Amino acid sequence: MVLGKDGLLIEGFAAPGLNTEDLAARVPALVSEAESLGRATQQGSLNTAILEHQKGYSIVAALADETLLLVLLRPSADLGGLLFDVRRYRGNIASLI
C-alpha cells in the first residue's frame, strides 16, 4: 500500500478481510515514534521499519518526504529479497506517485 504520512491511503490492496484505509490510518503513529527514536539516538530519519508479528511481517518504508510504503508479508516470505527490492526500487516507486 502507498499512503501519505498523514495516514491517507493513496493506493493499495490487501488480503480479503483487511481494510486498507484502516491499516493506512494506523501507520503514522508508528512512523512518528520511529522518527522520534531516530532523533533520540542520533541515527537520523526513518528509511525502513520491520515489524515481526506472530503470523507475518509488516514493512514500512519511506518513499519520499510525505509518502510511505506498507507491505504485509506471510512468515514464509523472502524478507531479505523484499528488503533488497524496496531499497533498490524506492526511488522508482516514489517517482510514480
Where are the predicted features?
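Acidic, low-complexity cytosolic segments
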Residues: 6-97
